[in-house]
Amino acid sequence: MAANMYRVGDYVYFENSSSNPYLVRRIEELNKTANGNVEAKVVCLFRRRDISSSLNSLADSNAREFEEESKQPGVSEQQRHQLKHRELFLSRQFESLPATHIRGKCSVTLLNETDILSQYLEKEDCFFYSLVFDPVQKTLLADQGEIRVGCKYQAEIPDRLVEGESDNRNQQKMEMKVWDPDNPLTDRQIDQFLVVARAVGTFARALDCSSSIRQPSLHMSAAAASRDITLFHAMDTLQRNGYDLAKAMSTLVPQGGPVLCRDEMEEWSASEAMLFEEALEKYGKDFNDIRQDFLPWKSLASIVQFYYMWKTTDRYIQQKRLKAAEADSKLKQVYIPTYTKPNPNQIISVGSKPGMNGAGFQKGLTCESCHTTQSAQWYAWGPPNMQCRLCASCWIYWKKYGGLKTPTQLEGATRGTTEPHSRGHLSRPEAQSLSPYTTSANRAKLLAKNRQTFLLQTTKLTRLARRMCRDLLQPRRAARRPYAPINANAIKAECSIRLPKAAKTPLKIHPLVRLPLATIVKDLVAQAPLKPKTPRGTKTPINRNQLSQNRGLGGIMVKRAYETMAGAGVPFSANGRPLASGIRSSSQPAAKRQKLNPADAPNPVVFVATKDTRALRKALTHLEMRRAARRPNLPLKVKPTLIAVRPPVPLPAPSHPASTNEPIVLED
């Protein structure tokens, strides 16, 4: 009974999907809906698999610092892997979930420097947290403050003075006297002066337009003038005027008008006060977060002062009473029976008895976590095409802690690695490529990428390094191995060392004499080999009446034999390949063209035309151009004398038909 009773403040497991791990949440409120169901307002806690890899590395560095400072005992790699499943990240994100999705209780504690990490592995359903995750900003912050110890943060305590020894320090620089208790005024005179100061403050608010809007009544103005800011200013005025009441009175009411003193309660507008109440409802008394997210234009001191003044108002008292009444009306606890429905991921073997799970388990397939071959129940785990499964104990571990007991390749790490990554960070193709059950052919398909055209633009220092550090760079060898890495930092350092010495002997540049394109084209045309003539024998006479002979068969059979010989009975598809047997091309549309594999697509070729090539085009007739396009592998014979710019052919003048007065008739 007590195990199924859940109260406000409990850490519980929530199940949002049958194939995903449980969600760890803290119950903040239990509300009853109009339908009679119970909803739980919970605080979200995140696992390592829920955050990015960069934040995981940040959490790893924080864990290493904690182990060094607290001098944790050494743990094995498997224990370190399981400790990452016990670490959670607190957040300030709230959500509402049905109470019927609760699957059990757990314990979450703040990591203390006196804790031993290995103790968390000995306890069931036990987690810890030390960092706070912000789902919006994607940041990790420490949840607790730090004690600054050292001479940099502590004050230096001077030695005690001997009796009769004077203090040679300048007291005016160290402190300022704001009130003298041995003043000549009596307590009655001081109280009368404070009453006058309140009256001056009330009169000043009546003259001020903005104050008259905020405090429309005399009672509200008098209450605002009676706050501590007015009394502190009056007492400071007495101290500065040597406790002379006449001088102090004239200071309160100068020539320009009475002095108006305002505190944070009057400086803040109504909208800013509403923002503060909303932030206080969300963050509590975390003034740094309130200032950062809601009131960035206010100083931290201003927010703290407003908070303690706001607690003295009637609005705070009313809200406190309303919250107490709501807390009394809300549910304090809820009873959720144990969830007994079977999980959809259970594997029911073919031929097994009803109610038995895993009876006919296939040989050769083991648990992905503990590699056992026998279990009372088996559960499908991972992508469906992988056919991975877990035993009953490993499935419960996966649901509670969001990982496997041992790091596997499907989780994103090789067995024995020190830092396995969560499988939740991998897509399905990546998980398949890392799985031991994926064939090499499938991996090759996954690694295939589309070819992209790129431009490599080098700097002057890189071009110098090619010549000065040729022995280290080995450009010819590197060109044959474009995927082998090159230590650019070492070559850059060596180039900077050799650069001062090489400046004395400048490099000799041998310019290449490049012939014009027209000359190269003429040489290619002259050197083009002649097309070899194929030997042609005597033509075999064809007996045209041979096909029409009967040869002992009927007319219909002769026609079919002729169609078979001529090839008319073999239909061809749109891409030139014969259709498969059983497909009729006459009654069905043409077959779909085959698509090229992106990895087999040819590289783009760009042909830049010049004046000479354009002249060659003009020297050819339209028929020769089409013949050359059909046979691009054969050389093209062009007479050099024909390479000349032909005079432009005058266009014939358009002939306009003579206008007639006869009507134009359009026939359908």
From Swiss-Prot:
A zinc finger (GATA-type) spans 367-394. Widely expressed. One of its GO terms (biological process) is genomic imprinting. The modification Phosphothreonine is found at T534. The keyword GTP-binding does not apply. It is found in: Nucleus. There is a cross-link at K492 (Glycyl lysine isopeptide (Lys-Gly) (interchain with G-Cter in SUMO2 and SUMO3)). Residues 1-144 form the BAH domain. Residues 263-315 form the SANT domain. Residues 145-256 form the ELM2 domain. There is a cross-link at K492, K508, K559, K595 (Glycyl lysine isopeptide (Lys-Gly) (interchain with G-Cter in SUMO2)). This is Metastasis-associated protein MTA2. It comes from Homo sapiens. The lineage of its organism: Eukaryota, Metazoa, Chordata, Craniata, Vertebrata. The gene is MTA2.
